[in-house]
């Protein structure tokens, strides 16, 4: 390969479309804005959801639900992520954070049953799914709700 044989990657050098530069360019005269109207004028700034003065959809529909300020948000950990630990390890939220499996604890850690557990572990967490609980005890490990 020589310097003069180098070519840019396909599609990486797309030419900017210059509008309003003659009719034969394909984007002359109206510059791709169509004919007259609000959107053809300069400085147009229609906010998202604006329907030309008609009551917009988000105001025609009723409000629903609420945000529960007391809802607990758990950090989720799957069984397959626990395989990084040695047999007989006591897995706590602090240990999970040190191992880089979780970033922050939030309201606690919830262990879910996705994946397959191959080690015998003692897992301490705020919550366990039924499948995770069954998988941990099936491998001879134990769970503890903290």
From Swiss-Prot:
InterPro entries: Ribosomal_uL15, Ribosomal_uL15/eL18, Ribosomal_uL15/eL18_sf, Ribosomal_uL15_bac-type, Ribosomal_uL15_CS
Highest taxon listed in the record's lineage: Bacteria
Pfam families with a match to the protein in the record: Ribosomal_L27A
Gene Ontology terms describing biological process: translation
Similarity annotation: Belongs to the universal ribosomal protein uL15 family.
Role of this protein: Binds to the 23S rRNA.
HAMAP family: Ribosomal_uL15
Protein name according to UniProt: Large ribosomal subunit protein uL15
